């Protein structure tokens, strides 16, 4: 017992510790070919990467310490360097903005689709310049951005999916993380696959994956893979090996179909409240999130409908917006709430 802790007090991390212990015991009964090493990318790390790859059409997967860092690696692998422009949504989670500016690149925020709050493909195409090197499309609140339209309207520009909030979501039947040139998943707290912390980078094709490995991994992993040594500036920031075990254990018992079914049921209940407008088009968007994002009209009563609970929106406004756009986006975000069935 920690010094000073009251006798008989329930440990605040009891449930979390139990889940970690269960995952480690589960892995102890496994039969991996190699010991687990984040340096070599072996054992549980390799198994986790293979599991995420299998769930995403065989796209090569790379386990990384956070989704934000994975976004940075994805941008680097796309060739983004200082001074380049990256098109992104005016309404976005700030980590995407941070990944762009960490490389010295310039975020170019464009208008959101009012039906989804995700990046509007036509606005993105209009913002393209000779300095545009990539598009970062965030699937906000599990609602997929229209990545196929982005690829069609911006030929030759790599499209990176920020699927941190959309593991298991679909657009027109296509799985989030399989539509762009690269995609990032989050294993952070509160995500569908919660490993405590971590991110997964999915790549279209081996060449892009090998560039990501050279950017992010230890020289020994490159040597074993038959790749040349990394540049001297490579950071070799690796995930904790226990995170790989936690992700594998959670993934083994997780069903995207069941999560999407639960989301659809919550959306069906919400659809009966005519004062709410659900984000996304249920004919196109199938979300795996336990919550359903809605827009509230001006003057909507503070109390939620019976049987529903409300959570604040996680969306943020990029600092790069001009002041009038920032004010308009802030007013819009003030009306965004996440509604979820009580007890889910």
Regions from the PLM with identified roles:
Residues 115-195, 200-202, 206-207:
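Active-site phosphate-binding strand-loop segment of PLP-dependent enzymes
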């Amino acid at each position: 017992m920690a010094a000073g802790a009251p006798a008989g007090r329930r440990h605040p991390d009891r449930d979390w510790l139990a889940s970690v212990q269960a995952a480690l015991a589960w892995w102890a009964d496994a039969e991996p070919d190699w010991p687990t090493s984040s340096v070599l990318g072996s054992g549980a790390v390799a198994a986790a990467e293979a599991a995420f790859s299998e769930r995403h059409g065989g796209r090569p997967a790379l386990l990384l310490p956070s989704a934000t860092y994975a976004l940075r690696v994805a941008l680097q692998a796309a060739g983004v360097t200082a001074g380049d422009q990256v098109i992104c949504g005016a309404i976005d989670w700030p980590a995407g903005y941070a990944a762009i500016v960490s490389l010295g690149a310039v975020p170019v925020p464009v208008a959101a689709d009012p039906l989804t709050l995700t990046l509007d493909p036509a606005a993105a195409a209009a913002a393209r310049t000779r300095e545009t090197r990539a598009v970062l499309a965030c699937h906000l609140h599990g609602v997929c951005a229209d990545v196929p339209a982005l690829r069609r309207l911006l030929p030759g520009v790599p499209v990176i999916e920020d699927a941190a909030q959309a593991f298991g979501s679909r657009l027109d039947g296509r799985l989030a993380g399989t539509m762009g040139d690269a995609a990032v998943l989050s294993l952070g707290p509160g995500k569908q696959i919660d490993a405590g912390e971590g991110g997964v980078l999915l790549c279209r094709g081996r060449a892009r994956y090998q560039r990501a490995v050279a950017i992010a991994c230890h020289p020994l992993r490159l040597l074993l893979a038959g790749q040349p040594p990394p540049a001297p500036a490579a950071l070799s920031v690796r995930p904790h090996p226990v995170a790989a075990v936690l992700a594998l254990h959670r993934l083994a018992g997780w069903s995207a179909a069941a999560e999407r079914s639960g989301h659809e049921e919550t959306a069906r209940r919400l659809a009966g409240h005519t004062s709410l407008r659900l984000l996304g088009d249920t004919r196109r968007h199938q979300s795996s999130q336990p919550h359903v994002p809605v827009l509230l009209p001006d003057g909507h009563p503070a109390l939620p409908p019976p049987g529903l609970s409300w959570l604040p929106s996680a969306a943020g406004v990029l600092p790069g917006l001009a002041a009038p756009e920032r004010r308009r986006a802030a007013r819009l975000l003030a009306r965004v709430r996440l509604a979820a069935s009580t007890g889910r």
